[in-house]
Amino acid sequence: MMKHILKYILIVFLSFVSGRLLAQEASMITRLYDTFSENLVTLEVDYSVKGGGPEVKGKAELQLQGKAYHIVGGGYDIYCDGESVWIVDQTSKEVIIESLTEGPEGYVTNPALLLSRLDEFFDVKSIAGRKYTLKPKTKGEITAAEVAFSPEGKLVSGVFTMSDGNAWTITVNKMTMAPQKPLTAFHPSVRFDKSWIVTDLR
């Protein structure tokens, strides 16, 4: 479950920076989009999942550079170099390797698709101040979404409602920027020797 939580954190994060979806705030979104396109951006977030079972809470750190990203939280590391995704469980010494996925559900296995193609998956249902309610164009895991900005155009929060009834809430506590780094920095740093269970689905 935790690996899915971390992926949806990234989905909410990327939903803020689509340069085309929120046309009503074009100048602010364009500036934010350019910032993410030209820098290595680090986010520190809190997340919670509410639904049929006990509430799940936690913290995570995300780094994004173009379509590459690295997420750390809940005992998992998720790396993506823009072509492949590594889901690493350091405790159990297991790793799953996946190729990026295209199509309407591609954002589940490749949330980076939202950076440039969110408008292919969602429509803006309503706008209230700096809060945007989004509606998916096709039936899938996400049934509704709501994202919000600060007056300065910074990321604030996002809530995604899932088809299983769970509601995912993400709050952005801190955002920093740094110069871009080589894409090899988005590969796992650990060597997967014989002590690891490796599932390569590419």
Predicted regions and their residues:
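Bacterial N-terminal signal peptides that target proteins for export
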Residues: 2-9, 19
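Hydrophobic h-region of N-terminal signal peptides that target proteins for export
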Residues: 12-22
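N-terminal leader/targeting segments and the immediate start of mature chains
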Residues: 20-56, 65-67, 188-202
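Non-transmembrane domains of secretory- and envelope-associated proteins
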Residues: 24, 128-130, 138-144, 152-202
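Short beta-strand segments that buttress and anchor functional surface loops
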Residues: 45-49, 70-74, 131-138, 157-161
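An acidic-aromatic
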Residues: 61-108, 168
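Short, solvent-exposed coil/turn segments at beta-strand boundaries
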Residues: 62-70, 79-84, 127-129, 148-156, ...
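Flexible, surface-exposed loop/linker segments and immediately adjacent secondary-structure boundaries
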Residues: 100-130
